[in-house]
């Protein structure tokens, strides 16, 4: 068969399938299936965009094969589709093949009055893409010609138009709808126009960028209001708004995406004690977690995974978004307690001591906190070097009762309640605090001997009428004058207080220093 006459011009924005249907309507007035049989083209090959089928159609139509190939959606490797320079999955194609803009079809009829209607109606490529829901030229929503007909039983386009009652009836059914910002980005990307999505989107496929924008925007706008399952019920208008929101974020690059993840996490952080990734990041995490490992979602997965590891207490060996966690980055109060083999109360006191937790924080609020693993190394080191009360007494050169008194007065901060120390053999006191206490007292003290009017700390406490631990606290506060360091002694047994200072304090001590003994 030679070149068909009359020649039918190819519209660059229509699909190869649409052109073949128009060619059949012009030259035979019959069905596309019988027309393709006459040309020796298998319908399934043309639907799949097979190079041989497209080339044969271009040959008989007198078209440049490359021009027609640019309008064909081709199957690639069984998992992907290609269109022009874009690659995407079948999920990016609308399952409704018969979506049209009635106003565009009316324009087609008006422009080609000499052609039969079936030869003038052009099915636009953009109508096949899932994010496209409205016509930017006419400001109306796309109309589904056969919403109740399964895809496999879909009649040919001409028959669908007859079922719908023609173009005029379709125009009456169309509703005003402006295209969303994300749809306009898809149009520009597909047509090869300058990409204003920024470098973060520019490095992604059209599907990766569009899906990331939609889901990120949906979680930002509706994540707090919808349960995870109800996102399927979002309306077309809600998805349009979500896509626009996500696009604005994506245009700001990776930094803006991370800031959006901060917002999502902050909104959901109070919903549960130590909520996992699904509770914290909602739809965004669910979408990425259950996505096929063979379908790369693009850099949004990396950004979310890094955000999870930087903010949630994830155990080494756990799998997060398809990758095993090699090293812990964050600790929760619970996981840290388990690692240190302490109670959660002891751990919280340790975190307060190293400045990682504010004092007096309610237990529920404390359980929601997460701490950088490197930051809590100070606490880990303190626990590793901690000693028992008896060992602390030996290191300080005092009695166990005096160590307990120092804890009662707040001079030492144990890992367990000081009220329990007499009944426990647990590691309770960080050794570095003991050394720091002795060093501070030595720096404050002047050397003296027992004959210079100086009392040992225990005797000075009795004279001043305060417990031993409170006396040491008063010395550290400078309220008993300069202490003395008695020669030939070690540890706290060398601590001395001027007798005159103890007498003066006894006669004028404020009531708030009276501590029951």
List each language-model region with its residue ranges.
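Intrinsically disordered, low-complexity regulatory/linker segments
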Residues: 1-517
């Amino acid at each position: 068969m030679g070149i068909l006459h009359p020649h039918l011009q190819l519209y660059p924005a229509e699909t190869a399938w649409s052109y073949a249907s128009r060619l059949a309507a012009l030259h035979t007035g019959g069905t596309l299936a019988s027309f393709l049989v006459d040309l020796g083209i298998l319908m399934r090959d043309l639907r799949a965009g097979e190079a041989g089928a497209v080339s044969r159609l271009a040959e008989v139509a007198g078209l440049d094969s490359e021009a027609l190939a640019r309008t064909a959606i081709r199957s690639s490797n069984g998992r992907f589709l290609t269109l022009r320079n874009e690659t995407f999955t079948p999920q990016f194609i609308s399952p409704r093949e018969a979506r049209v803009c009635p106003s565009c079809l009316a324009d087609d009829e008006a422009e080609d009055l000499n052609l039969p209607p079936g030869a003038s109606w052009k099915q636009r490529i953009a109508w096949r893409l899932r994010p496209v829901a409205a016509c930017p030229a006419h400001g109306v929503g796309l109309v589904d010609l056969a919403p109740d007909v399964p895809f496999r039983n879909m009649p040919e386009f001409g028959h669908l138009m007859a079922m719908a009652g023609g173009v005029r009836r379709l125009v009456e059914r169309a509703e005003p709808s402006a295209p969303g910002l994300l749809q306009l980005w898809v149009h520009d990307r597909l047509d090869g126009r300058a990409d204003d999505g920024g470098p973060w989107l520019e490095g992604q496929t059209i599907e990766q960028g569009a899906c990331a924008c939609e889901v990120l925007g949906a979680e930002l706008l509706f994540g707090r209001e919808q349960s995870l399952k109800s996102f399927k019920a979002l309306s077309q208008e809600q998805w349009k708004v979500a896509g626009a929101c996500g696009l604005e974020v994506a245009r700001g690059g990776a930094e803006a995406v991370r800031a959006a993840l901060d917002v999502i996490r902050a909104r959901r952080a109070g919903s549960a004690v130590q909520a996992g990734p699904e509770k914290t990041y909602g739809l965004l995490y669910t979408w990425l977690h259950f996505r096929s490992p063979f379908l790369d979602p693009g850099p949004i997965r990396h950004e979310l995974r890094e955000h999870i590891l930087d903010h949630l207490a994830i155990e080494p060996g756990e799998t997060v978004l398809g990758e095993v966690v090699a090293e812990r980055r964050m600790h929760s109060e619970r996981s840290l307690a388990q690692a240190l083999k302490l109670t959660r109360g002891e751990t919280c006191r340790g975190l307060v001591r190293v400045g990682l937790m504010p004092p007096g924080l309610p237990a529920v609020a404390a359980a929601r906190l997460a701490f950088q693993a490197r930051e809590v190394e100070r606490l880990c080191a303190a626990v590793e070097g901690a000693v028992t009360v008896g060992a602390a007494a030996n290191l300080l050169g005092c009695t166990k009762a005096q160590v307990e008194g120092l804890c009662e007065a707040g001079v030492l901060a144990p890992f367990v309640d000081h009220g329990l120390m007499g009944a426990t053999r647990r590691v309770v006191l960080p050794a570095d605090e003991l050394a720091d206490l002795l060093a501070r007292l030595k720096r404050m003290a002047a050397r003296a001997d027992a004959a210079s009017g100086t009392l040992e700390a225990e005797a000075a406490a009795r004279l001043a009428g305060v417990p031993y631990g409170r006396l040491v606290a008063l010395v550290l506060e400078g309220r008993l004058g300069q202490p003395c360091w008695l020669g030939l002694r070690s540890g706290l047994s060398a601590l001395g207080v001027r007798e005159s200072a103890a007498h003066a304090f006894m006669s004028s001590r404020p009531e708030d220093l009276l501590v029951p003994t």
